[in-house]
Amino acid sequence: MENIKNPKNADDCSDSISKNSHQGVDDSLNQSRSYVCSFCIRGFSNAQALGGHMNIHRRDRAKLRQKLMEDNKDDVVAESDASEVVSLDLNEQQQQQGEALTCDDHDQYVDNDISPKQKLEFWVQESKLDTNDHGKVTEASIDGSSSSHHRDIEVLDLELRLGQSVVKKKTT
């Protein structure tokens, strides 16, 4: 920095001080990090200031998140309504498409020869676990097949113990 001795007038003094202060700011900007709010793109000189500023946007983010969840919920409902179809008759769909193509486009050749009835079935692989009176777990498949597996149900010991662990075995 320059030392200013006896300036000729006050304007010269203020000009040199502002130049020196801008040089200091420029040097510090090159060395310090800039923190930017991702919500409103406002810049901050330190992380603490940005953190305090982000608290302002907490409600805005909550409203935005809620709106996105509602939009996604509507999409999921629409997809689940469409996915309830268990089987699809391909012959009927092909006939409808063939008729639509022949009506709309007379110049294009459409093959109306449809193979014997085709059916596409969707399989669901889900199972339910039932517990019988003897403490065994039986797996019952939803599709009607009867495959059962017997497993012993272990009782979980959730007691909190301090010190060395001691394992007690129950005799049955």
Swiss-Prot record:
Disruption phenotype: Altered response to auxin, but persistance of the telomerase activity. InterPro entries: Plant_dev_regulator (IPR052426), Znf_C2H2_sf (IPR036236), Znf_C2H2_type (IPR013087). SUPFAM superfamilies: beta-beta-alpha zinc fingers (SSF57667). GO terms for cellular component: nucleus. Keywords: Activator, DNA-binding, Metal-binding, Nucleus, Transcription, Transcription regulation, Zinc, Zinc-finger. It is found in: Nucleus. GO terms for molecular function: DNA binding; DNA-binding transcription factor activity; zinc ion binding. GO terms for biological process: regulation of DNA-templated transcription. It comes from the Eukaryota. Residues 15-28 have a biased composition (Polar residues). Activation factor which mediates telomerase activity and potentiates responses to auxin through the regulation of BT2. Binds in vitro to the DNA sequence 5'-GACAGTGTTAC-3' of the BT2 promoter. Contains a slightly degenerated ERF-associated amphiphilic repression (EAR) motif, which may be involved in the activity of transcriptional repression. This is Transcriptional regulator TAC1. It comes from Arabidopsis thaliana.
